[in-house]
C-alpha cells in the first residue's frame, strides 16, 4: 500500500456544481453542512481519468514510448477489474487530520453563536456570485438573467490518495495525470476552473533519459 498527499490549488473562479438551487442562487456549488466548500472524490477521480487519457494521447502524438506507463483500465476499472485499487477521498480546505478538529470547533461556535457563525456566512467567505444573461439583438432577453456561485481563486484543497498493489508503471501514469490536470468545473472555455494539482509522487525519470 502507498499513500500520497495531493493538493488542488484553485487558480481562477471555479464552479463545482452541486446540482442544487434556491431562491437566491440558481446554481450552487458543493459544500458540507457547516458551509465549507470541498472537492468531491468522484469528480476528482473522473477528472484524473480524463487527464490520464490525454497523457497517453500526447505520448502517441509525440511518438514517445509508453511502455513505462500502465494501461488505464488496470487503474480505473472502467470495463473490467484488476488487483490495483486507487482510493480517492473528498478533498477539504485542510488535511483530513486537521479538518476533523477544525470542524468540531466550528460546530461548537455555530451551536453557541448560531446567528453569527452560519453555514451561509461561511460559504460566502469563500465564494462570490457571477451573473449572466442572454443577449438578443444586443438586448438582454427577458427572463434570461441568472447567477451561479463560484469558489474564489486562492483556495486550496488537500487529500491523501491510496494505491493498493501498484507498480512503477501505475505511479508513472498517476504522476503525469496529476501534473496534467489543470481545469475542472463548468465554463472552462471562459476562464473559469483553472487549477494546479501537486502530489508527492516521484516524477517519471524515464522522461529525462537521453535518446
Describe the function of each predicted region.
Residues 1-126, 140-211:
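RNA-binding basic/glycine-rich loop and surface signature characteristic of RAMP-family CRISPR effectors
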